[in-house]
Amino acid sequence: MTVGHLGQSLDGFIATHSGDSQFVTGDDNIVHLHRMRALSDAVVVGAGTVATDDPQLTVRHVPGPNPLRVVFDPGRRLAQTYRVFTDETGPTLYVCSQALVESGETRLGTATIVGVDCDDPSGGISAALGLLRSRGCWRVFVEGGGVTVSAFLQANLLDRLQIAIAPVIIGDGRPAIRLAPHARLSDCRRPRYRVFRMGGDVLFDCDLQADATLSDDNDPNVPPVNQVI
């Protein structure tokens, strides 16, 4: 099971144009993220998330074990100064292009370096996921950011996608999901979904392996639109 997650504004951004993203969503989503980490074998983020947020990717707000922390940086642009490469609160796997790993090189700070083939159509995403499965990581949580989650989604490697939407309008900034365009709406995916309230935010939990009409699986606990006014 591979699950992607993004927290975004009403207008579809995960950060401002300057990269300020802490925090688009509220405290309830932070707790949810920690719960998802605790339930996962591995948590994956891209280089942009590490560079912008310097996350720990550990479990702190709920009981549970720390997952394997995985940083996907195919272009190898990150220095070893970030917390995932300097602390020992949990194991870290640094995945980059095999072409950028020097002979005999195995470590980046406290992290283990693994090179993968990034020349395939998925840009190395498929190889990275295969690597995790070979290490026994079957429950994978792709926590961000937009580029990495979009790459997993474009490669059809996500089983579920969670989108937390906060009641904020950013106007312009770093987008959430960006995929190859479709000319017709009939070609666009409409996955089956469930809706959950998280404090002031709303979480859409989408099953990407099952299509549904817009009316399918509406949560009965969410009031219908005729009660808005």
Give the role of each language-model region.
Residues 1-229:
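Enzymes that bind and transform nitrogen-containing heteroaromatic metabolites
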